[in-house]
Amino acid sequence: MRVRNKPWAKGYMADHLDRLVVEPEPLKGNWQSRFPSNQPLFVEIGTGKGQFIIEMARQHPDRNFIGIEIQTSVIAVALKGVVNSGLTNIQLVHTDGEAINTFFEAGEVSGLYLNFSDPWPKKRHTKRRLTSPVFLAHYADVLQPEGQLQFKTDNRGLFEYSLGSLNNFGMVFEGVWLDLHAATDGVEDIQTEYEQKFSKKGPIYQVIAHFPTNN
């Protein structure tokens, strides 16, 4: 998806480095220093314009949240939303989430969110999917024991691939939804801006799973 350039973005980001991290590696193992309270840490990879992560932070003041986004013009919009929200339990990171294990310590993360990731539909691009085995290995490194991975998409092909990938990796499924918005089991459903725009075109799929613990 092509994102329109925002001339104000870089200046705004430079003015709000208390809410935005541009060099995450030095914070490995010490992310709690970015928050006023030491609380369980939840991370969204590909946070977009921030609607999901901001609402999560608002509804869960007893958790700390980090939203990772690589596109400058997109994360600038998210940053403006974070600043305007006044919430102190959320930080944004301007980087590529593919290398998550290089800037989070083992077991530092309580939960991970993957919302509407790029489906990379061509077979030669399979390894780029955020639910491919190489990325699952990174998530397994940083998640605490039984920390949840929550994956949501509107792409049936990507969802089916992801179910197989998670299963082959030995993950334990806690819930699978083939039409999340029609669910009646009380599952938490905080929507992204993309989700609100496109959910009328078809079902939203979700899986929640965790990695097995070593006995």
Curated annotation (Swiss-Prot):
A GO-annotated cellular component: tRNA methyltransferase complex
Catalytic activity: guanosine(46) in tRNA + S-adenosyl-L-methionine = N(7)-methylguanosine(46) in tRNA + S-adenosyl-L-homocysteine
Binding-site residues, substrate: K122, D154, T192, E193, Y194, E195
Residues given in the record as S-adenosyl-L-methionine binding sites: E44, E69, D96, D118
Keywords assigned: Methyltransferase, S-adenosyl-L-methionine, Transferase, tRNA processing
Pathway: tRNA modification; N(7)-methylguanine-tRNA biosynthesis
SUPFAM superfamilies in the cross-refs: S-adenosyl-L-methionine-dependent methyltransferases (SSF53335)
Enzyme class at the top of the EC tree: transferase
GO MF terms, alphabetically ordered: tRNA (guanine(46)-N7)-methyltransferase activity
Iron-sulfur in keyword set: no
Pfam families tied to this protein: Methyltransf_4
Catalytic residues in the record: D118
Gene3D superfamilies: Vaccinia Virus protein VP39
EC number: 2.1.1.33
Family classification: Belongs to the class I-like SAM-binding methyltransferase superfamily. TrmB family.
PANTHER family, A to Z: 3-DEOXY-D-MANNO-OCTULOSONIC-ACID TRANSFERASE/TRNA GUANINE-N 7 - -METHYLTRANSFERASE (PTHR23417), PENTACOTRIPEPTIDE-REPEAT REGION OF PRORP DOMAIN-CONTAINING PROTEIN (PTHR23417:SF14)
Functional note: Catalyzes the formation of N(7)-methylguanine at position 46 (m7G46) in tRNA.
Protein name: tRNA (guanine-N(7)-)-methyltransferase
